[in-house]
Amino acid sequence: MGKLVVSLDGVVIKEVQITKDKTTLGRRPYNDIVIDNLAVSGEHAVLQMVGQDVFIEDLNSTNGIYVKSKRVRRQHLNDGDVVVIGKHELIYMDERARFGRGHFAEAHAQPRPDEDA
């Protein structure tokens, strides 16, 4: 399961768990993730869960969505990807990847050559 951390000018505004197959994002109040800013279209983008993967898709917004500084129409999100919409940054955090790098990875790590076995 993943989450988005939404920030503006480096200040975290909200954190949203991605739990639905489709999560809408836009300026209008009926969206699942509301960003009240004129640079954000009323119905700007949708996050889609496909199995364990999360994709973001632009819904023909005026200002687009950017991932890794490139304007994209549809993009698979990886842990740590930064999505830019207007002046807002949305950081995608994949909790599976974080667990894999943490507890599981440490438990199965091979000792370094300079460590005593």
Regions found by a protein language model. Give the residues of each.
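Regulatory inter-domain linker segments that are low-complexity and enriched
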Residues: 1-6, 88-117
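Forkhead-associated
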Residues: 5-8, 12-87
